[in-house]
Amino acid sequence: MGKKKIINKNNPEALKEAGNKAFASLNFKEAINNYTLAIEIQPNHIYYSNRANAHLELN
C-alpha cells in the first residue's frame, strides 16, 4: 500500500510543491486547489502562474 505524504497546510512552499506533483500527475484540479491555498497564505506571482497553467491544462 502506498503512503500518502502529509502536507503542512500552513506552508505555502509545501503547497506549491504538492501542486507541482499533482500537475505532473495530470491531476489539475488538485494542483489548482494546492496553488490556491498557497496564494491565500502568501500571494506570490509563481503560485498565480502555476495555477493559471493548471487552469489552461484543465480546459
Regions found by a protein language model. Name each.
Residues 1-59:
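Alpha-helical tetratricopeptide repeat
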